[in-house]
Amino acid sequence: MGQIGIWQILIIALVILVLFGRGKISDMMGDFGKGVSSFKKGLNEEDKPAEPAAKIEGPSHEAKPAGEAAKDPRPADKQG
């Protein structure tokens, strides 16, 4: 009783075909194929050595020393 036979599989396939239509199923399978090929491409790229990281340059302007910035402890809106 718990086994699925060929007739049950054919009926399920027919219901799916009627619900989604032939065009929608072919679109889904095409998208699935693109996903698999993209996944394989990603795996192949992982094997390649990574390019060296770009050098990060420091700031182009000089920062003020911390003492100069904190001379007046009042908030900026209350100065004056």
UniProtKB/Swiss-Prot annotation:
Q: Which residues form a coiled coil?
A: none
Q: Which GO biological process entries does UniProt record here?
A: protein transport by the Tat complex
Could you tell me which Pfam families the record lists for this protein?
A: TatA_B_E
Q: Name the principal localization, coarsely classed.
A: membrane
Any single GO CC term annotated in Swiss-Prot or TrEMBL for this entry: TAT protein transport complex
Its placement in the membrane is given as: Single-pass membrane protein
Question: What residue intervals traverse the membrane?
Answer: 1-21
Q: Work out whether the entry's keyword set contains Transmembrane.
A: yes
Q: Where is this region: Disordered?
A: 38-80
Q: Name one GO molecular function term.
A: protein transmembrane transporter activity
- Keywords per UniProt: Cell inner membrane, Cell membrane, Membrane, Protein transport, Translocation, Transmembrane, Transmembrane helix, Transport
The protein's location, in the record's own words, is: Cell inner membrane
Signal peptide stretch: none
The record's annotation in InterPro entries points to: TatA/B/E (IPR003369), TatA/E (IPR006312)
Q: Where is the composition biased (Basic and acidic residues)?
A: 58-80
Glycoprotein as a keyword of this entry, yes or no, is no
Q: Which HAMAP family match?
A: TatA_E
Q: How does it assemble?
A: The Tat system comprises two distinct complexes: a TatABC complex, containing multiple copies of TatA, TatB and TatC subunits, and a separate TatA complex, containing only TatA subunits. Substrates initially bind to the TatABC complex, which probably triggers association of the separate TatA complex to form the active translocon.
Q: Tell me, what does this protein do in biology?
A: Part of the twin-arginine translocation (Tat) system that transports large folded proteins containing a characteristic twin-arginine motif in their signal peptide across membranes. TatA could form the protein-conducting channel of the Tat system.
Q: Which family does it belong to?
A: Belongs to the TatA/E family.
Name of the featured protein: Sec-independent protein translocase protein TatA
Instruction: Please tell me the species this chain comes from.
Output: Erythrobacter litoralis (strain HTCC2594)
